[in-house]
Amino acid sequence: MPETEDPATGLFIKYLSNNRIFRDREVLRHSYRPQILPHRQPQIDTIASILAPSLRNETPSNILIYGKTGTGKTASVRYVGSELEKASSTMGTTCRIVHLNCEVIDTQYRVLAQIAKCIDDVDEASSDKAKIHIPMTGWPTDQVYSELKNQLDTGGGVLVIVLDEIDKLVKKSGDDTLYNLTRINSDLKNSKVSIIGISNDLSFKDFLDPRVLSSLSEEEIVFPPYNAPQLVDILTQRAAGAFLDGAIADGVIPLCSALAAQEHGDARRALDLLRISGELADRDESKQVTDVHVKQAQAKIETDSMIECIATLPTQSKLILFSMLTLEQLGQNIFTSGEVSRVYQDIAPEIQLDILTHRRITDLISELNMLGVINTRVVSRGRYGRTKEMWFDANTGKIREVVLKDPRLNGLKDLDINQMETKWLKTWFR
């Protein structure tokens, strides 16, 4: 450690003492809940009007909410839910909200158990004797369902169950959970249940029994994508709390908004762009966030998204990518599907991987192009016909690093490229 460095703060002191950009960067996080949601008042009013009967101890209609990622669905539902609980407390009624993320809680057992747990957490009226503690595994599902009904009737009032990313639950576990929840009111004596399903995938309805769909979609609300001017309003509101005065150049918010509007009006993307732009400016010790930082942030987000996409690819697709990386390592920036196929066929036996047909390899190359991992074009070679050429635009070092993290491909780190090149030169490599 340098002699001048304060041991209490260490190497972080210079990063903490030179803040010229942020007032509170948490305001730009997805988890931040603003008091006002610009351009979502019509949807908020509709949700509130549907849930209002719960304040009279009446059963609200079930709601299905649709919209692409970053269109304010979850934030609007959370806002209305918070206001409903405040109104309930003021009026002396019992209205409770349980919010479940079905990407994590994705089985019938876990959904029922988590609802019971959340009721325990929020229901101060229930006595310790009335409270139940359902384990997250181990009970028969019908016992969990029975205990949940008992707890609901003990607490009374109205419970609104929000199933965020409901499509993930349906696709993994079928519609049994929704079937039971949409019919639970017929088994309750002293309480009532309403369900709000949130999804960015309309196709999940195809997996539902018509009776379940009819009960679940008593009301449907669509959240349209934000346009660029609306995103400007959202970012301007957040920026006031997130950045110090004068820390943002004039063109930054319009540029972030325009870029995010191209990505189907995603407010989350716009917020990420603005936050990362600020972080890059902060690290550079710049006095202002500029358009240059926004463009750097855009490139970083696209790279990070692509790397995450590559990490989830099947092993065969990763090996095809590795074959392209090998060609590039040998000096080729553009390669044909035939060249990639031949390198792949030579490398696959090295790691005891089944060799795919050329047709299947071509299909996987098309998928990689569709995902934005590579670029392709079809070119004519006269009497030799047409062929597909491909190349990388992204940082191939990062792609290689992610590909080789696959346990099946890890051994390729030690592949002797020079030896392989000698073999190819003797056979086909030009």
Curated annotation (Swiss-Prot):
- Keywords tagged on the record: ATP-binding, DNA replication, Nucleotide-binding
Recorded hits in Gene3D superfamilies, A to Z, give: 1.10.8.60, P-loop containing nucleotide triphosphate hydrolases, Winged helix-like DNA-binding domain superfamily/Winged helix DNA-binding domain
- Encoding gene, per UniProt annotation: cdc6
Q: Which family does it belong to?
A: Belongs to the CDC6/cdc18 family.
Q: Does the keyword Protein biosynthesis apply?
A: no
Question: What GO terms describe the biological role, i.e. biological process, of this protein?
Answer: DNA replication
Q: Which residues bind ATP?
A: 71-75, 226, 238
What is the official name of this protein in its record? ORC1-type DNA replication protein
| Protein function | Involved in regulation of DNA replication.
Please name every pair of cysteines joined by a disulfide bond in this record: none
The record's listing under InterPro entries reads: AAA+_ATPase, AAA_16, Cdc6_C, Cdc6_lid, ORC1/CDC6, Orc1/Cdc6_arc, P-loop_NTPase, WH-like_DNA-bd_sf
Any single GO molecular-function term of the entry would be: ATP hydrolysis activity
Give the SUPFAM superfamilies listed for this entry: P-loop containing nucleoside triphosphate hydrolases (SSF52540), Winged helix' DNA-binding domain (SSF46785)
